[in-house]
């Protein structure tokens, strides 16, 4: 996925979870933050952020904050995409290109977003029609996508805050598997260069427990990293889980 009209700015403050104040071309600008999560380890005073300009004259803010540079001692800054809508978009592009096959997710003949099942609404429902031994075979499954912006020393971690909704999704995915569907949770790591992914047990041990229980129930637990640039985000391949 790509962005248009990108500008570098200096982060100043975040008055609430929807907006931030930045310095752009020497002036203070209020911008929309495309991530309502805490992001406290990312949005630090004076850090470099990247904004996408909006052509909508009716908007209250002229820019969306979509990425940030994280300073690392002795290393170059790490560019992290923090657009909460991006993981689903790049996952869809990745699936439709057939690139999920290496991780057991087929190129779908049907890929439907925001599909309800049971008490949840999953990010994607997919079907794949094929032929085996001259017999038509229909595979079908659900995928829940989680965007990851937290890293510690090259380890990608999710979640960055407690998420009861995430726990519910994992339990529902296990129920999908029991009902005969294929099921997966895919963590889209919105940065490059990670050595592995792990559930953030320190922040939300219940999520880590639910993830392991789902895996034992047959839910695929996948993580993929991305090539992140100020104006683009693309899934590049798997990260060890």
Give, region by region, the residue ranges found by the protein language model.
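Active-site metal-binding core of divalent-cation-utilizing nuclease and nuclease-like domains
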Residues: 78-85, 90-96, 100-149, 168-171, ...
